[in-house]
Amino acid sequence: MAALAVKPHVVVEDGNDDVSEVSISNDEESGADSDHEGADAENSGDEDGKSDEEQNEENPNAGWAEAMAKVLGKKTPDTKPSILLKNKQLDKIKEKEKKERLEKKKQLDKKRAWENICREKPDVVQDREHERNLQRVATRGVVQLFNALKNHQKNVNERIKEVGGSERKKSKILSSVSKKDFIDVLRGTDVAVKKEKEIKAEKSSWSVLKDDFMMGASMKDWDKERDEDGGGGEEDEREPAQEYSSESD
């Protein structure tokens, strides 16, 4: 706008002609200088605007980063609430929790190491026979347990049947059943099997080899055991003698 305004050249016919012409020429020169300065300012403003726009196009987050940097750069007193990122108390709490976790982990590792001092992993190749024996023992134990359960249930059912339809007596019998009874049954299964085996072994052996042989016999019965043992043999021996005598006759 300053460039469009042109001052007219006015000539005043007066005694001071030289002074008026000089002042007008000075005014024209100052107006031209101001026009040039205004144009330079507009050009520089346009260049600055273009440079800002170009920077924003190249890095659109630059303004946001500057704003956040200003906010974070402010120093806030301890009495006022601050951003959690700058809260030093929270950092101290996190550091304390981290130390506690590490301490607990060390204690657990120490405990596990103490428990695993004498533990060894079994070798399947070398300890194959030992493992088989253990499997057999475990199988026998399981079979014995289920047999004991079956016998215990059978005994309880028989006692309930003997009572009849009395609910009071049934409840009394069921309340009288305890763990001790079951343990006795569990122990008695093995004992009963051993006793049966011993009885069979004793029956198959010769009576002379028994521990109680001739313990309860009196002197007058000393030959009965011998007759019972060898009775069949004497009869067999006598029969051919009789046959021989009949032939001689």
From Swiss-Prot:
Alphabetical GO biological process terms: maturation of 5.8S rRNA; maturation of LSU-rRNA
Compositionally biased tracts (Acidic residues): 14-32, 43-57
Domain of life, per lineage: Eukaryota
Biased composition (Basic and acidic residues): 220-229
Coiled-coil stretches: 83-113
Cellular component terms (Gene Ontology): preribosome, large subunit precursor
The UniProt record lists the keyword Hydrolase: no
Keyword Coiled coil part of the UniProt annotation: yes
Region Disordered, annotated ranges: 1-87, 217-249
InterPro entries: Rrp15
Keywords: Coiled coil
Family of this protein: Belongs to the RRP15 family.
Protein name, as recorded: RRP15-like protein
